[in-house]
Every structure is written in structure tokens, then in C-alpha cells.
Amino acid sequence: MAYQLYRNTTLGNSLQESLDELIQSQQITPQLALQVLLQFDKAINAALAQRVRNRVNFRGSLNTYRFCDNVWTFVLNDVEFREVTELIKVDKVKIVACDGKNTGSNTTE
């Protein structure tokens, strides 16, 4: 099963809103909407793992951290993100990090 972290992104929220509208107008069933979301989870995780090759460095002050159910959560303050030609400063960042390897069954889906 793929992580559902990306459902709370702009793309994921837009997809969920569109699916909700289709359910309300009875154009699709809730079960079909769930299948679409599950496919989105798999596709976005695979695309990010295979296609994104940019590198960004960041530095900040660690406020809190937590490790629960194989998921790390970090909250950083006064963070600087550096790319090759760009520097972005933000007051607070929450990072959620999950194991990128498939820890489930060995079946291919």
C-alpha cells in the first residue's frame, strides 16, 4: 500500500474535490472514487521516486521530532532552503519522512 501523504497537496486536494463533486452528482460511486485515490497514491509515489532528480539543501533549528509507526516527523524553525541559484527562508517547516521501500508483500501491483 502506498503512503497517502500527497493527498494533502494542491494536486491531491483538487483531485478529492473533483471526485466529491462527481459523487454528489451521482456520476461515479464512492467506491470508484476510492479506487482513483488509491491509484493516485501509487502513481505519485512512483513518479516522485523515479522522475525527480533535483537536490535542495536546507538548514534550520530543530524544534521537535518524533518517530512513530516507521514515520519520522520533524518540525524546524528558521529554515533556509538552498538550490543552486536560489535561497528561500521560512519561519517553520514540518517534514514527514517515510520509508521509501516497499515493506509490504512481495507481490507486484
Swiss-Prot record:
Protein name in the entry: Transcription initiation factor IIA subunit 2
One Pfam family of this chain: TFIIA_gamma_C
Organism: Homo sapiens
Similarity comment text for this entry: Belongs to the TFIIA subunit 2 family.
Superkingdom in the source lineage: Eukaryota
Source organism phylogeny: Eukaryota, Metazoa, Chordata, Craniata, Vertebrata
GO MF: protein heterodimerization activity; protein homodimerization activity; RNA polymerase II general transcription initiation factor activity; RNA polymerase II general transcription initiation factor binding; RNA polymerase II-specific DNA-binding transcription factor binding; TBP-class protein binding
UniProt KW Nucleus keyword: yes
Subcellular compartments: Nucleus
Disulfides per UniProt: none
